[in-house]
Regions:
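N-terminal Rossmann-like dinucleotide-binding module
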Residues: 1-46, 324-331
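Hydrophobic residues in well-ordered beta-strands that form the structural core
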Residues: 13, 52, 92, 117-119, ...
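Beta-loop-alpha module in the N-terminal Rossmann-like domain of NAD(P)-dependent dehydrogenases
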Residues: 46-109
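C-terminal helix-rich "cap/oligomerization" subdomain common to oxidoreductases
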Residues: 66-68, 286-332
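Rossmann-fold dehydrogenase core element
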Residues: 104-123, 143-144
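Predominantly a Rossmann-like dinucleotide-binding segment in NAD(P)-dependent oxidoreductases
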Residues: 126-196
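Contiguous beta-strand/loop segments that form the cofactor/metal-binding neighborhood of enzyme cores
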Residues: 184-255, 285-295, 331
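Active-site loop of classical SDR/Rossmann-like NAD(P)-dependent oxidoreductases
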Residues: 273-285
């Protein structure tokens, strides 16, 4: 069993802690928070014995083997760099960084230190991903793919009332593309590689953040469309349309509700849905395996790192093409 600490106290950290503990491989020992009271309350909630308000001290703690990072996007780079420099394995929530160069730098640093640096993206670590891959191979030539993640933000009402929640604050490197679009980009690149070209259109909010977007990716033999939004709720599946059938996926981010629709009109359910903590538990299990079985998992882990860089590169291109700029871009 390995000991881990956390940065971040939102619902997603709750789910990761639940999943990691449920795996039987991880023990939560420490919590980092800039707010001492909040840190103590969060540690008590989850049974962590140590609380830190100083990042350097947290990173230097010998009772921590690895850290789960779920802070605002704009903080990922500096926090992950500090943790890696102090010899901690790191699993960081998507997206890793707004700029691909920073992702490359962190990957290189982790390699030099002999550490695991991994992006927490549910899609890539679910066992049903193999079912999806097999199904994609079974439906003939694919000409059209629609990947959708439109989910009305729980913070939207606050924004409409005049507040500025983190998710709609571009100073924190957020917005629909960074928060939800990444879940569509990952399967596109994982299954089909980088497109020949793409077009992107976004709906800008008064805060400067993108509230929704549409991307059309051109491949030699297919079109892949990405739709993502934090302003409204989707009512349709993602799907892969082939000459011999269609694969419908109710949740592309969770790989939940996967169905194979045959040409004769019959349907076959390939996978249902899972509780969120179990989905994140698979991330925690792979993270543990990459750390404890480096030789056996090297190829798989290397592919994960390469895909994280490819996703960061494409997302950065998309942002610039759509006119979505962050303050950190000027430092590049």
């Amino acid at each position: 069993m390995l000991n881990f600490g956390t940065i971040g106290s939102g619902w997603i950290t709750d789910e990761y802690i639940h999943g990691a503990k449920d795996s039987g491989l991880w023990n939560l020992t420490a919590v980092y928070s800039r707010d001492a009271l909040r840190g103590k309350e969060y540690a008590a909630k989850h049974g962590a014995k140590l609380v830190f308000t100083d990042l350097e001290q947290f990173a230097d703690c010998k009772e921590i083997d690895a850290v789960y990072v779920a802070s605002p996007n704009s903080m990922h780079y500096a926090q992950c760099k500090t943790l890696l420099k102090h010899g901690k394995h790191v699993i960081c929530e998507k997206p890793l960084c707004a700029q691909a160069d920073k992702v490359r730098e962190l990957v290189k640093l982790s390699q030099e230190k002999g550490l695991v640096f991994m992006e927490a993206i549910m899609f890539l670590h679910q066992p049903q991903l193999k079912l999806l891959e097999q199904a994609v191979q079974s439906i003939g030539a694919i000409s059209m793919v629609k990947l959708d993640f439109c989910q009305r933000s729980s913070k939207l009402d606050r924004y409409l009332q005049g507040e500025l929640p983190n998710i709609f604050n571009p100073q924190l490197e957020t917005g629909a593309l960074m928060d939800l679009g990444v879940y569509c980009i990952y399967p596109a690149l994982y299954l089909f590689g980088k497109p020949e070209s793409f077009q992107i259109s976004t709906n800008k909010m008064a805060s400067g953040a993108d509230g929704s977007g549409i991307v059309t990716m051109q491949y030699p033999d297919k079109l892949v469309t990405l739709t993502y939004s934090k302003l409204g709720q989707a009512g349709a599946d993602s799907d892969f349309q082939g000459t011999d059938g269609t694969i419908a996926v109710a949740s592309i981010s969770r790989l939940g509700g996967i169905r194979l629709l045959h040409r004769d009109g019959t349907a076959e359910e390939l996978h249902g849905d899972d509780e969120k903590y179990k989905l994140m538990g698979w991330e925690a299990k792979d993270f543990y395996r990459y750390i404890t079985q480096p030789k056996e998992s090297r190829d798989e882990y290397t592919k994960c790192s390469e895909l994280s860089i490819a996703v960061a590169e494409l997302m950065e291109e998309m942002r610039h093409k759509a006119g979505i700029h962050f303050a950190s871009d000027s430092a590049q």
